[in-house]
Regions:
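Cysteine-centered iron-sulfur cluster-binding motifs in ferredoxin-type domains/subunits
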Residues: 41-54, 66-89, 95, 127
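Pocket-edge positions in alpha/beta enzyme catalytic cores
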Residues: 65, 95, 127, 187, ...
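Short, charged low-complexity linear segments at domain edges
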Residues: 18-38, 46-67
Length: 292
């Protein structure tokens, strides 16, 4: 959806699909880590950022991608004519377009779980703000059903896209990816000043914001990064934060996409390192959840 690193600094993206059609890559049911209760999580495809630690590389491109699972391949060569003719299912498409009506029907299959657990629907990504108009219309529909709504976002978009969507949510899981402005700009391709401005705006508008801080060796797993985040959050009277330790669960996805992951040999944070970050936040008065 973007053509150069310079353009990838923000979510100033022209929505390329009709507003009643979205591009997603997964619907995950029975999630317990993306908001209150049992959640159905809709993962939108496309992200303007380039986080080296991304665990969902299939979410980055806004295009529908086709991958081949070598273990399933029969080497019959039928795919040379048409990948859809593959008899073994070795070819897999990542991403699909779905209408408002179809997505509404899909998530409402889980309504009984929402009502019995206090759960609901969470929109994640990729970056949901790249398809903000669709997402806003979709949550408006869910609100008519009385469904609890949440989004997970990095907040790097014009407030005109973020605020109407956030106001439909019971929770906004706000990813504070990195607090160093230079790394945010040059590595992650993120507009950190705007992210922080949007964070403050949401809080001032009464939105229930839950910041999420990734703990990434070499980037954010440091006292300095944590203190910078706390310095931003303390004046906002936010009481709850999530700490998300780095993991290697995404490594097979990079291989499937034919990509080399720069962090494939990076170890997860030690329990002692995570405890240090947690203690800093708790001493500052925050209720801390590790893992979301």
């Amino acid at each position: 959806m973007t053509s150069s690193a310079g353009q990838r600094i923000s979510c100033n993206v022209v929505e390329t699909r009709l507003n009643d059609v979205a591009r997603i890559f997964n619907i995950q049911r029975y999630s317990l880590n993306d908001g209150e209760g049992i959640r159905t999580v809709v993962f939108f495809k496309g992200c303007p950022h380039l986080c080296p630690w991304c665990a969902n590389p299939e979410s980055i491109s806004g295009k529908i991608q086709t991958v081949r699972r070598e273990a399933k391949c029969l080497h019959c060569a039928k795919c040379l004519r048409d990948a859809d003719e593959c008899p073994s299912g070795a070819f897999e498409r990542i991403g699909r377009d779905i209408s408002l009506d179809a997505l509404e029907r899909e998530v409402m299959k889980d309504d009984i779980f929402f009502r019995t657990s206090g759960g609901g629907v969470t929109l994640s990504g990729g970056e949901v703000l790249m398809q903000a108009e669709f997402a806003t219309r979709f949550l408006q529909r869910l609100r008519l059903w009385g469904v609890s709504c949440a989004i997970e976002t990095a907040g790097d978009a014009p407030a005109s896209k973020l605020l109407p969507l956030a106001k439909l949510c019971d929770e906004v899981l706000f990813d504070l990816k990195i607090m160093d402005a230079t790394q945010a700009r040059d590595v992650v391709k993120m507009n950190l000043p705007r992210v922080l401005e949007n964070l403050r705006l949401l809080v001032s508008e009464g939105v229930n914001v839950i910041p999420r801080l990734p703990l990434i060796p070499g980037f954010t797993l440091s006292r300095e990064n944590m203190q910078q985040a706390l310095d931003v959050l303390i004046p906002l009277n936010i009481r709850q934060i999530h700490l998300l330790p780095f993991h290697q669960y995404g490594e097979p996805k990079y291989r499937l996409l034919g990509k080399t992951w720069s962090m494939k040999d990076v170890a997860a944070p030690s329990s002692a390192d995570v405890a240090t970050m947690r203690e800093m936040a708790e001493r500052a008065g925050f209720q801390v959840t590790v893992g979301g």
